[in-house]
Amino acid sequence: MLECQSMMEKLSPFVDVASLEIESLRRIKRPKRFSEEESEETENTTNSSNAVFGFPNLPEEPNRDMDQSVLCRICVRLPDGRRIQRSFLKSESVQLLWSFCYSQIGDESSERKRRFKLIQGFPGDYKNLYFGSNTTFEQSGLANSLVSVTWL
């Protein structure tokens, strides 16, 4: 019996530390579930904001009277079947294309929350476009092309 008692005395400092750690963990706020975060997010955001997905602000469309060597025209096919066009400067970031597509997606809140991807199609193949690429329209080869928006 003495062995058990001495063993308990040796382990007691560790048990005390463990109980303190458990108490401190109980005091920490529990992370919110996804559905709770989603409901708060929908209350705090508006449908016209690009900030929901972190897209950059879309500047005004360049004037068509500008030199055609610095402009490119992009045609976008949306998931609802509409086709829209917009001019960009060839030196602008491709990330603006995501802002433009997001601004044209339907006004229903369910569509505004959905994630989408952009695909550039050409005969016999297609290319997925990635938001993280910091290239210009000229560097990416998107100048004067057709891009499709599809839901993820």
Swiss-Prot record:
It holds the Pfam family UBX. InterPro entries: Ubiquitin-like_domsf, UBX_dom, UBX_domain-protein. The gene is PUX12. Keywords: Ubl conjugation pathway. Residues 67-150 form the UBX domain. This is Plant UBX domain-containing protein 12. Residues 32-61 are annotated as: Disordered. It comes from the Eukaryota. It comes from Arabidopsis thaliana (Mouse-ear cress).
